[in-house]
């Protein structure tokens, strides 16, 4: 791979690096929150997702090799939303969420990343960038399929999952 001679590929890898880095950081952050609330199955799952993001980040670094990637400012990233596609939304998380809900959140993130990579491939005029972006999309699709298989093994959520059973802690 010659990202230093291929600015389109270097730009793609810079986006991929940021996408995976942000996803990993967010999953690790969510794992810590779930662990603090003793929601250990969900914490463990979020840590697994953080490790997968770290593996993807290593793949990006390997593809880039010794070539420095463009250093983009936050507003120079071309994301479909405010944050990178694979970054879990804070609004979608609850400290009492079930493992099923965590998998559904991760599945939506994997599908968003898959779509992003497909769109990047479709929009690129560079053959090598299209090939690598399509490969990344296929990899995300594989992760999504694995999550879908795992979801089939989990029970449906109960109706009282988000009900608070603790009294609010208010100063007297």
Question: Language model features by range: what are they?
Answer:
Residues 1-172:
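Iron-associated oxidoreductase/ferritin-like identity signal
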